[in-house]
Amino acid sequence: MSGGGPSGGGPGGSGRARTSSFAEPGGGGGGGGGGPGGSASGPGGTGGGKASVGAMGGGVGASSSGGGPGGSGGGGSGGPGAGTSFPPPGVKLGRDSGKVTTVVATLGQGPERSQEVAYTDIKVIGNGSFGVVYQARLAETRELVAIKKVLQDKRFKNRELQIMRKLDHCNIVRLRYFFYSSGEKKDELYLNLVLEYVPETVYRVARHFTKAKLTIPILYVKVYMYQLFRSLAYIHSQGVCHRDIKPQNLLVDPDTAVLKLCDFGSAKQLVRGEPNVSYICSRYYRAPELIFGATDYTSSIDVWSAGCVLAELLLGQPIFPGDSGVDQLVEIIKVLGTPTREQIREMNPNYTEFKFPQIKAHPWTKVFKSRTPPEAIALCSSLLEYTPSSRLSPLEACAHSFFDELRCLGTQLPNNRPLPPLFNFSAGELSIQPSLNAILIPPHLRSPAGTTTLTPSSQALTETPTSSDWQSTDATPTLTNSS
């Protein structure tokens, strides 16, 4: 579930409870081997829900109406105050459309500043083991928002909140505000993340075409995947790994084709040398090193997942539909062949002596339909590599020839609308891999001197953040979950 509401479908997540936040209310995540959760329609049933692990919300806690910043915990570093319950008692969700709920919330980005925020038209659009997602309308601007409400452990900072507060990119769902509210039980505290609302998900868009026995237009595949890779390049430059890339977590506006990555409930700032849990990411999209139990993985697990999403859009179904953790590896081997000893060592050195059945790789051209563009197949094969370091980086993927059509002047969406903003790179984005900039910036947006032309167009380079915007900073030391 997400800004777009519940979607159902998709594979189950990890065996521990997972927050499949926005796009999909989780059914029960499979235990142990991570069997498919729930039973809703779509390939693999519903994904499991995952409780947002990690750290509890930092900084000033904004209470519900009347509580004041910090509530009983006090302002500043005193922690969040519970305030009143949200939604308030007596509000009949979906019925009392004119009733206004007012809370004191903290701005999602920038300096910690609290203000009163009023909502109307509150209704549930998804739920799971992690909590509930509501849709609401801001009373002042009439803008729709999604409110993700999760039970908060007062001992920890909330990792999802910490990460979302530092992210600011056009292809990432924006945190507008956050506030805390009390629950029905004594000392129960909830964190409410107020997020921009995006109506659809890539999962539901793809399912629409599949049900109609149609193939999703290749230009939409290009536009969606390009924006996904751009969002990954940004978060990876911040040291953040999403760890749950799947179609259900890719929000899209069906009219403009703008894509926004959502659900950072599994995301983590990866630090070299520090171990991470391997049982992460929804099964169909899990990188092989995770299946091998690696704990020192890198952000390239997101690239593998993105490769699975690309393949799924091209095929009309998941490329690796494993029934369990072990079967997931079998599905991968059926396509890529048995990994070599060196590839296994790169994924997890502890498995080098394990005996695997020797299976030859299936030719990529036979994996996909005959009409699949060769550039799409080439990109897929460069993403779905056993060796993590051999996978393309997200920006290298953006620069791939598969996306050249997007860089051509005059290219439009199939609905005859202009392309969404694809080239409004910030200085920070252009500093990630400068050698790629000559490809990433289309010729028609370059000045004669070779620099980017500054124009009012949404396709041009516009923002220039300070260097501090691109520092990967750790949260204030506190008791935290290291998974």
UniProtKB/Swiss-Prot annotation:
PTM comment, free text: Phosphorylated by AKT1 at Ser-21: upon insulin-mediated signaling, the activated PKB/AKT1 protein kinase phosphorylates and deactivates GSK3A, resulting in the dephosphorylation and activation of GYS1. Activated by phosphorylation at Tyr-279. (Microbial infection) Dephosphorylated at Tyr-279 by M.tuberculosis PtpA, which leads to prevention of apoptosis during early stages of microbial infection.
EC supergroup of this enzyme: transferase
Biological role: Constitutively active protein kinase that acts as a negative regulator in the hormonal control of glucose homeostasis, Wnt signaling and regulation of transcription factors and microtubules, by phosphorylating and inactivating glycogen synthase (GYS1 or GYS2), CTNNB1/beta-catenin, APC and AXIN1. Requires primed phosphorylation of the majority of its substrates. Contributes to insulin regulation of glycogen synthesis by phosphorylating and inhibiting GYS1 activity and hence glycogen synthesis. Regulates glycogen metabolism in liver, but not in muscle.
Residues annotated with Phosphoserine modification: 2, 21, 72, 77, 97
Annotated stretches, region: Disordered: 1-96, 449-483
Biological source species: Homo sapiens
Record-listed E.C. numbers: 2.7.11.26, 2.7.11.1
GO biological process: autosome genomic imprinting; cardiac left ventricle morphogenesis; cell differentiation; cell migration; cellular response to glucocorticoid stimulus; cellular response to insulin stimulus; cellular response to interleukin-3; cellular response to lithium ion
The protein's name in its UniProt record: Glycogen synthase kinase-3 alpha
Regulation of this protein's activity per its record: Activated by phosphorylation at Tyr-279. In response to insulin, inhibited by phosphorylation at Ser-21 by PKB/AKT1; phosphorylation at this site causes a conformational change, preventing access of substrates to the active site. Inhibited by lithium.
Coiled coil: none
Gene Ontology terms: cellular component: apical dendrite; axon; beta-catenin destruction complex; cytoplasm; cytosol; mitochondrion; neuronal cell body; nucleus
Modified residues (Phosphotyrosine): 279
Active site per the UniProt annotation: 244
